[in-house]
Structure formats: structure tokens, C-alpha cells
């Protein structure tokens, strides 16, 4: 958005629904249009657009109610994404699953076009934030040395990466911290015989702690700090739709994306994936246990 604005283009950013509060500080965030809140206006913009850039998703199903409007728009469509198996709904597809984040891919694309000098400090802050959050603070999918060269280039734009970290990870509500304590004490089950762990939350439990979107960000990673745990799954009843959101994380060579695809209608990267489950929490937990049994050999494999 910042780059295209610098090229004197008329640009609008539309997202399917609310984004987490910890990202609201970002330059330009106040101008983002929520499709679920301003549907008629968003439909008009999509229908009148010359180009639609589809960022960080590779299937129309990922953008919920916004999918039909994007599909039916006469605009030329371009996908920029880093997830596996892109669908062919765009004329131009720039898909690189080996890249750590779509933000990194956007940076590379701008530089390849010869416009590095046009990246502003505000644009650099957004790119860095996307790279940081999509790699868990550079703790997974981030061993490529070029990532850190890119960070050095972003630093040359005047960004304060320490301040960005604080704004993203150190501005949570009291309710989130109490919810985290509750989860760790009551809602985390460790399966040492499978080197795995499970965390789960119901709608009622989220309501009890005044849940807002983003409050459970990173919860799935917590069990991975336990010695020998290499696979963690977080099941959360969605507060807006009648389904269970599934987050999967792993370390090393364990393919949580295969588990996501086989058991939870999802997919993603080797160490970070997501999915959805339509059923009860008990059924979802049973499915998780079935996955442990099926993948026992890989879960117990020596490095």
C-alpha cells in the first residue's frame, strides 16, 4: 500500500474481517476497509478496480464472504503468496513457498523492479512486521541468511525493530495474560509418549476472559518450550463462526502441514500450519489423538 501510494496510484486495502488489536498501530491501519463491516462500499471498490492484488492467500475460500466479490470483479488479478498449492484464480501468480513470508516476497518484488529507494520508513515498518509475525519472531522458517540481509536493508530506512517488537508482543491486555495462565494450568495436555501437546479453548472460556481477536496469538507455540515436545496443536472454538480453528506448530522435520491437510481440512508450511474443523470440541480432540497414533513413528524419530 505504501509503495503503490508512493507511485501515485489510488490504492485501497480491504480485509475480510477484523484484524488483531496488536497491529492497529501500523502506519495506514486506520485506512483499512473491513469487508464484513463495509460490504457495499468494498464491493463497489472491487468491481471498479483495475487491478486486485491478492496478498498472503492462495485460495478464494481463505477470504470468506469476500470471495465472490473478488472472483466476479472484472479487474486483473495478481497473487503474491508463499503458501503451498495455489489455486489458479489470478492472471498473474507469484508463489514462492520457500520464502518465509509474503512480506519478504513483496520486498523482493519491489527491489527486483528497481524501486528499493522508493520504500519509505512506514512501508519498511510494515514489511518488517509481516516478516517478524509470520516467522514467530524469526523462530521458524527463518534460517535463510538473506532474511537478515533484508532486515539490514529495512533498518537502513530508519525503522526501530525493537520498538516494533514491543508494539506487537508487549501491548496485550490484562485479560490475555490471565487467559494464558488459565490455558497453561487447565487447558494444556502433554502427551510425552508422542512428544506432543494439545491446547484447547471453548467460546465460553474465551468470553470469561473478555477475549478479543489476537488474544490467543502465539499460544500454540508455548508447549514447544517443553523439553522433547516437537508438535503442538491449538483448538479454539471460533467466536464468529460455528467451527473450530486449528493451529499446528512443530520443530525440526515433523510435517505439521501433512497433519493439517489429512485431519483438519488445512495446510501450510512444514513447521507452521492451520486448519478448520466442523464438529464438537470432543470430536476435534479425538481426531488429534488419532493423528498422534498415525504419525507416531515420525514423532518419535531421532534427529
Q: Model-derived features: where do they sit?
A:
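Short alpha-helices
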Residues: 80-150
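Conserved phosphate-coordination/catalytic loops
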Residues: 36, 100, 213-214
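Active-site cofactor/cluster-binding pocket
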Residues: 33-92
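Short hydrophobic "helix-edge" motifs at membrane interfaces and signal-peptide entry regions
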Residues: 71, 123-125, 255-256
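Short acidic, glycine/serine/threonine-rich loops at helix termini
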Residues: 24-27, 66, 89-92, 107, ...
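Hydrophobic helix-and-loop "lid/oligomerization" segment in the mid-to-C-terminal part
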Residues: 1-27, 40-43, 48-49, 128, ...
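Generic hydrophobic/packing signal
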Residues: 27-30, 56-59, 110
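Short, hinge-like loop/turn segments at secondary-structure boundaries
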Residues: 28-33, 72, 95-98, 250
Amino acid at each position: 500500500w505504501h509503495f503503490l501510494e508512493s507511485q501515485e496510484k489510488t490504492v485501497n486495502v480491504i480485509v475480510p474481517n477484523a484484524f488483531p488489536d496488536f497491529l492497529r498501530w501500523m502506519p495506514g491501519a486506520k485506512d483499512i476497509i473491513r469487508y464484513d463491516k463495509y460490504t457495499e462500499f468494498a464491493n463497489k471498490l472491487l468491481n471498479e478496480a483495475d487491478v486486485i492484488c491478492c496478498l498472503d492467500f492462495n485460495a478464494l475460500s481463505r477470504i470468506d464472504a469476500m470471495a465472490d466479490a473478488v472472483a466476479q470483479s472484472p479487474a486483473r488479478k495478481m497473487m503474491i503468496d508463499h503458501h503451498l498449492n495455489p489455486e489458479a484464480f489470478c492472471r498473474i501468480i507469484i508463489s514462492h513457498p520457500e520464502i518465509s513470508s509474503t512480506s519478504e516476497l513483496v520486498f523482493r518484488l519491489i527491489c527486483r523492479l528497481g524501486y528499493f529507494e522508493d520504500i519509505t520508513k512506514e512501508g519498511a515498518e510494515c514489511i518488517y512486521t509481516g516478516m517478524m509475525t509470520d516467522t514467530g519472531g524469526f523462530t521458524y522458517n527463518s534460517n535463510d541468511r538473506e532474511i537478515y540481509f533484508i532486515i539490514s536493508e529495512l533498518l537502513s530506512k530508519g525503522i526501530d525493530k525493537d520498538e516494533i517488537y514491543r508494539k506487537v508482543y508487549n501491548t496485550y491486555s490484562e485479560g490475555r495474560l490471565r487467559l494464558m495462565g488459565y490455558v497453561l494450568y487447565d487447558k494444556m495436555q502433554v502427551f510425552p509418549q508422542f512428544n506432543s501437546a494439545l491446547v484447547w479453548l471453548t467460546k465460553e472460556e474465551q468470553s470469561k476472559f473478555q477475549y478479543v481477536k489476537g488474544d490467543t496469538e502465539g499460544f500454540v507455540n508455548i508447549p514447544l518450550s517443553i523439553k522433547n515436545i516437537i508438535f503442538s496443536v491449538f483448538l479454539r472454538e471460533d467466536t464468529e463462526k460455528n467451527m473450530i480453528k486449528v493451529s499446528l506448530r512443530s520443530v525440526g522435520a515433523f510435517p505439521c502441514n501433512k497433519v493439517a491437510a489429512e485431519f483438519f481440512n488445512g495446510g501450510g508450511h512444514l513447521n507452521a500450519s492451520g486448519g478448520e474443523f466442523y464438529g464438537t470440541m470432543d470430536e476435534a480432540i479425538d481426531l488429534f489423538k488419532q493423528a498422534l497414533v498415525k504419525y507416531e513413528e515420525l514423532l518419535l524419530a531421532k534427529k
